[in-house]
């Protein structure tokens, strides 16, 4: 893994300022927001930024399974939570319940999907991380 990817994998949560008053009233598309700068690190309470359910893939990390980092409001392919959970999500949630970080607002075992050009879906399972950085198991 390149050094930059290693640094990004272990970086603290990202904290972005609120949208300006002149921004459109519709929810912002994470793929249209600029990537955060190196100086934008979280210095705000966790409750101010709950764990997002939408964000962009930043890179893949090698391992026994592909892993990705989900950064909200950054450009890239968007992942979203489906309305219904994956059939295996309940068993995975039970298996990973103890892995939840103390004080994390996120719950383990949530199922995400990534839309592909071929109209097929790739399931990704949420693993809890600090509020604005989510690790997904694909």
From Swiss-Prot:
Residues spanning the membrane: none
Segments for region (Disordered): 22-55, 81-107
Ranges of Pro residues composition bias in the record: 22-37
Domain of life: Eukaryota
Protein name, per record: Proline-rich protein 34
